Design a protein with these regions (language model features):
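Short beta-strand segments at enzyme active-site cores
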Residues: 37-38, 107-110, 218
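Glycine-rich anion-binding loops and their surrounding alpha/beta cores
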Residues: 2-9, 15-16, 61-67, 71, ...
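Active-site cofactor/substrate anionic-group-binding motifs, chiefly glycine-
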Residues: 49-115
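N-terminal glycine-rich anion-binding loops that anchor highly charged ligand groups
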Residues: 1-2, 9-56, 64-71, 290
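Short amphipathic alpha-helical face segments that pack within enzyme cores
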Residues: 40, 95-99, 290, 294-297
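A glycine-rich phosphate/pyrophosphate-binding beta-strand-loop-alpha-helix module
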Residues: 42, 90-146
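Residues in well-ordered alpha-helical elements
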Residues: 19, 36, 53, 137, ...
């Protein structure tokens, strides 16, 4: 069977396996499909609805083609989300990642520049003078010195370039909007992933189980891809190979409830200025609580605290006692040669 026949067989199967999905996506990573075949693949999956097997197989194909990163697995947390919620808030998960790094937990964040919002994770980190675009050796030094590094996704996933012209032409969400946060070359044991579409929650949790994550939280917070302080958050938790679905509120985390409008952000430099204020202990209550909620979940995943509530309170303590501000002064513009 040639690769086009294999693709057609996959696309006409309403319930393919992860292995079949991987076999269909591997030619894409090698540049073997024409744009017409790529468009057929993406549009058909969009119409059928992506399953956990589709996403797992596609992820395996792109991880197989990815450039490796030396630090992997145990004790590594990634915090990427899907974006696309249209809320244009400050960079909550990125700011929370830095709080967690300052608190002694390792974060290897894989991401990109802004696509759908005014400020992506790379944009705000660049404005905070956190070194980006490091080669793997220097990125390892950065992790060892600071507990944090940022992996610029295009540098590790050159195969994604094969699909970009078609994605731009289609101008609609595709499986790649979901795949992006899953494709860290660090293959982290721990992950928190915010999703804009709550219908994906159980599916993504199943994908994390299949990809070997030890612990993961998939979160949707009242319309945004973060843990919310403006309403309840739905969580799908992977732990001990079991997926549990539940809801938490800001009050259950020991935090106050705030209007979403109080978390409005701007571009990279504007959001970086807001994060500096928060780290210096001068952020608004809404901004502090929003970062603490997400950081608390990250501390919980790392087993630094037994509950998310205690993690959120630890995050507030690290903001108040200057630990996070000191971390930023120490590590911005550092040379990791």
């Amino acid at each position: 069977m040639d690769l086009i026949d294999n693709l057609i067989t996959y696309l006409t199967n309403p319930n393919p396996t992860a292995d079949e999905a991987q076999a269909a996506f591997e030619p894409l990573t090698n540049g073997d499909y024409s744009d017409i075949h790529i468009a057929a693949l993406l549009a058909t999956l969009k119409a059928r609805g992506e399953t956990a097997a589709d996403i797992t197989g596609a992820a395996r194909a792109f991880l197989k083609a990815a450039r490796p990163f030396p630090i992997t697995g145990a004790g590594v947390l990634d915090t990427a989300g899907t974006g696309g919620d249209g809320a244009n808030t400050i960079n909550i998960s990125t700011g929370a990642s830095l709080i967690v790094a300052a608190g002694g937990c390792r974060v290897v964040k894989c991401g990109n520049r802004s696509v759908s919002s005014r400020s992506g994770s790379a944009d705000v980190l660049e404005a905070l003078n956190i070194p980006l675009d490091l080669n793997p050796e220097r990125a390892v030094h950065q992790v060892e010195a600071s507990n944090f590094t940022f992996l610029f996704a295009p540098a590790y996933h050159p195969a994604v370039a094969h699909v970009m012209p078609v994605r731009r032409a289609l101008r609609m969400p595709t499986i790649f909007n979901t795949l992006g946060p899953i494709l860290s070359p660090a293959r982290p044991a721990l992950q928190i992933m915010g999703i804009a579409n709550p219908e994906l929650g159980q599916i993504i949790a199943e994908v994390f189980l299949e990809l070997g994550r030890e612990r993961a939280l998939v979160v949707h917070g009242s319309g945004v891809d973060e843990i919310a302080v403006h309403g309840p958050t739905t969580i799908w938790e992977l732990r001990n190979s079991t997926i549990t679905n539940y809801t938490i509120t800001p009050e259950e985390l020991g935090l106050s409830r705030h209007p979403l409008a109080e978390l409005a952000g701007g571009d990279g430099p504007e959001n970086a200025a807001i994060l500096r204020e928060i780290f210096a202990g001068r952020g608004t209550p809404a901004q502090r609580d929003a970062l603490a909620a997400s950081a608390g979940a990250m501390f919980y995943l790392h087993d630094r605290t037994p509950t998310m509530r205690e993690g959120a309170q630890l995050a507030l303590q690290l903001l108040d006692d200057g630990t996070v501000a000191t971390w930023l002064r120490t590590h911005e513009e550092a040379n990791y040669a």
